[in-house]
Every structure is written in structure tokens, then in C-alpha cells.
A protein has these predicted regions:
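Extended, small-residue-rich solenoid/repeat segments and analogous flexible loops
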Residues: 1-45, 49
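Short, functional N-terminal and low-complexity linear motifs
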Residues: 4-9, 22-24, 54-60, 99, ...
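The repeat-register position in solenoid repeat domains
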Residues: 24, 36, 53-54, 65, ...
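Transmembrane beta-barrel architecture of outer membranes
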Residues: 41, 47, 51-53, 59, ...
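Glycine-rich hexapeptide-repeat left-handed beta-helix
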Residues: 60-61, 66-72, 76-178
């Protein structure tokens, strides 16, 4: 038994089922915590520090790096999620990504509703509130914040702060949900 197995055996009764489903072709180069009933599907790639919540889905060819995925998050198809936090039941459509480095490599400023925060670092992805839906093929630029219960239309390039309960249709067109 290796040292990692010994550490796990100190935390869990190994006779009980720890019910995450990890496909044989998935690669996990943790440290990583994969929650109960989570699925890490075919060719998923998890590196850096990662917490994948209970019932979350990390799908086919999805890459995670330095992330927190709350319970029931779905990143099911060809996603990249780096240096990001995704709230409860957040869902990213196929091919949507969190960009975590600016193209000019400058430090990232997070733009809030009332102020800007200079982070002093070059890598930050996105922060999604609970029940956020991100459409297929969308890019969430570094430091993007999307408030809970919001929707991002497919093929969007999102930056800055999107208030809770909003629909992001395209740059400059954000409407309140009815």
C-alpha cells in the first residue's frame, strides 16, 4: 500500500463505497478532491489543485486547473476551466472556456459593479455564481464575474461583471431576466 492509500484510509472507512465515477482514460495529477457521485469522464484532464463537488460532471476532453467546482457543476464537453470557481449547479456548454491569462500578459484587474480590484497576478479565470448557464462556444475572459441565476448566450466573449439574474446576449447587451 502506498502513502496516498494510507492517507485515504485514515480519512475513510475503505469498506464503504466512495462513489465517484472516474473513467479509465481520465488523468488526475492532483492534489484533487473528487466528491461523491461526481463523474470524471473519458479523457478528462485534471491538474493543479482541484476540488470537484458532489454530483459534478467533468466531461469528455475537459481540462481543469486550479479550480473549485461546487456540487452539481457540469463542464461536460470539451471545456477548459482554469484558475476559476464555479458555483452550485453552474453549467458550461460544449466548448466554452474560462480564459485565465490576458493576451498581453499584463496583471489582471477584476471589474466589479462599484470598483475595480487589481489582483497583482497574471492568472485568474472566471467566477460563476450558482445556477449560471454558459452557452456553447463562449469565452469567459480573465477575471470575469457572472452573478447567480444568469445566462450567457452561445458564442459570447464575456468580460467584466454580469449582475445576478441577467441574460448576456452580446457585448453591451445585458438584460434582466423576467
Amino acid at each position: 500500500m502506498n502513502n496516498d492509500a494510507l492517507k485515504i484510509s485514515n480519512l475513510y472507512d475503505l469498506n464503504e463505497t466512495i462513489a465517484a465515477k472516474v473513467f479509465p482514460s481520465a488523468y488526475i495529477a492532483g492534489p484533487a478532491i473528487i466528491g461523491k457521485d461526481a463523474e470524471v469522464r473519458h479523457c478528462a484532464f485534471i491538474r493543479g489543485k482541484a476540488i470537484v463537488g458532489e454530483g459534478a460532471v467533468v466531461g469528455n476532453s475537459t481540462e481543469l486547473k486550479n479550480v473549485i467546482l461546487f456540487n452539481k457543476v457540469q463542464v461536460p464537453h470539451y471545456n477548459y476551466v482554469g484558475d476559476s470557481i464555479l458555483g452550485f449547479k453552474a453549467h458550461m456548454g460544449a466548448g466554452s472556456i474560462t480564459s485565465n491569462v490576458k493576451s498581453d500578459k499584463k496583471l489582471i484587474t477584476i471589474k466589479g459593479p462599484d470598483c475595480n480590484i487589481d489582483t497583482g497576478i497574471k492568472k485568474i479565470g472566471a467566477f460563476l455564481g450558482d445556477n449560471v448557464e454558459v452557452g456553447c462556444g463562449s469565452v469567459l475572459n480573465p477575471g470575469t464575474i457572472v452573478g447567480r441565476e444568469s445566462n450567457i448566450y452561445p458564442l459570447s466573449s464575456v468580460r467584466g461583471f454580469i449582475p445576478a439574474g441577467s441574460i448576456y446576449k452580446k457585448q453591451g447587451e445585458v438584460v434582466t431576466k423576467r
